Amino acid sequence: MFGEGEKLILFVGRLDDIKGVDYLIEAFAKVIKKSSNTRLLIVGDGNYSRYLQMSADIWSRITFIGKISKQKLYEFYQIADVGVMPSFHEQCSYVAIEMMMHGLPLIITNTTGLSEMIHHQNVECRLILKEDQNELRLSVEELSKCLLKIVTDDCWAREVGKLNRCRYKDAFSLEKMRMAFESFYS
């Protein structure tokens, strides 16, 4: 389906400003200059036209997948090399939980929900949202460095993925959530 040996960067979510897709596309353009065997997969629905225009120069390295079934999504989690969530706002993200369940290294922002869910995360994978004239901004440079680190350092990426899988088992598996639910109501 994709090129042999391609590194797959996976974004899953709505296509709108709050999810940071525009920053991701800009950062990805920098990544492929240094790691040309990399592909960005964008799964989700929304208005693609803006993002297609943004990615005109790199369209051959981006695959816009659209909305898909949960089973198909799980197949993408299994083949992806990294999950990226450059969101400006998240609460309890099912996408983050699913990515951790599949042992993906994640690149996240320091927005409240994600920081609480993935508190062990290596600092190099956590992007800092900065306020600029009452508007939150994300550093494209920081994001591209994080992406490049994961797609070029397989050993480190595997270790971060293992930490995420452990975090999933310790806090978000069905058994752990059932126990927490029972404890809360007893």
Describe every region a protein language model picked out:
Residues 52-68:
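Nucleotide-activated donor-binding/catalytic signature segment of Leloir-type glycosyltransferases, i.e.
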Residues 88:
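Aromatic "clamp/platform" in nucleotide-sugar-dependent glycosyltransferases that forms part
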Residues 3-19, 25-28:
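Conserved donor-binding/catalytic core segment of Leloir-type glycosyltransferases
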Residues 9, 24-28, 40, 143, ...:
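A structural motif in glycosyltransferase catalytic domains
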Residues 67-68, 75-80:
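Short alpha-helical donor nucleotide-sugar binding micro-motif in glycosyltransferases
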Residues 149, 156-170:
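A short, well-ordered alpha-helix in the C-terminal region of glycosyltransferases
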